[in-house]
A protein has these predicted regions:
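Active-site-adjacent structural segments surrounding the nucleophilic cysteine of cysteine proteases
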Residues: 1-48, 71-72, 91, 99, ...
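A structural signal for well-ordered alpha-helical scaffolds and beta->alpha junctions
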Residues: 18, 49-50, 68, 130, ...
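Extracytoplasmic/secreted proteins, especially bacterial periplasmic and envelope-associated proteins
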Residues: 20, 24, 52-55, 136
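Noncatalytic regulatory segments and standalone regulatory/sensor domains
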Residues: 44-46, 58, 80, 90, ...
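Helix-adjacent hinge/juxtasegments
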Residues: 55-83
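Structural recognition of the beta-strand scaffold that forms the well-ordered cores
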Residues: 65-66, 85-88, 119
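Short beta-strand or tight-loop elements
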Residues: 104
Length: 158
């Protein structure tokens, strides 16, 4: 399962990975908002944005679910509803980062159980989606207690 119409955006600053992830998700959901408005809404700082600040998007009438201890199985139901999942990770062992380790946010847009692959949009890079094995993905996600966020339109949940 892959959200094929998901449009990739690259982060504008080294510290705005969460802002870029939210921008991608909101554009995918057809929520009219500018990058500058997202920066303000998330209370982004020059050193980064706390992952939990995604909760401030509820002021826009959106639903925001932020949880810890997620599993790869949580992705499928959200993706089936057309909802990408933002995950909080550390890039430990992620080959496309060439052994650089940093705290980061990426968007999960697909999962392939048969081949044990996760497809992500990593806003630090210009190309997407990037595929990671379950094992590689989980090492980085575990570092952040498998935290994830799902942003949705209120009518999707009614």
């Amino acid at each position: 399962m892959l959200l094929s119409s998901f449009k990739h955006k690259q982060q504008r600053l080294e510290s705005d990975c969460l802002v870029a992830c939210v921008e991608m998700v909101l554009e995918y959901l057809h929520v009219p908002i500018t990058y500058t408005q997202i920066v303000k809404r998330l209370r982004a700082e020059s050193f980064g944005t706390p992952f939990g600040n995604a909760r401030f998007l509820t002021a826009l009438g959106l639903t925001v679910t932020i949880e810890y201890e997620g599993t790869v199985e949580i992705f499928e139901p959200y993706l089936a509803m057309g909802l990408p999942v933002i995950v909080n990770v550390k890039t430990i062992g992620w080959t496309h980062w060439q052994n650089e380790e940093t705290y980061h946010a990426v968007v999960v847009v697909g999962i392939d159980y048969d081949n044990q692959l996760i497809f992500i949009h990593d806003p630090f890079f210009s190309h997407a989606p990037i595929e990671l094995t379950f094992t590689t993905f989980l090492v980085g996600w575990e570092e952040q207690r498998r935290q994830y966020a799902v942003i949705g339109l209120a009518e999707l949940y009614e």
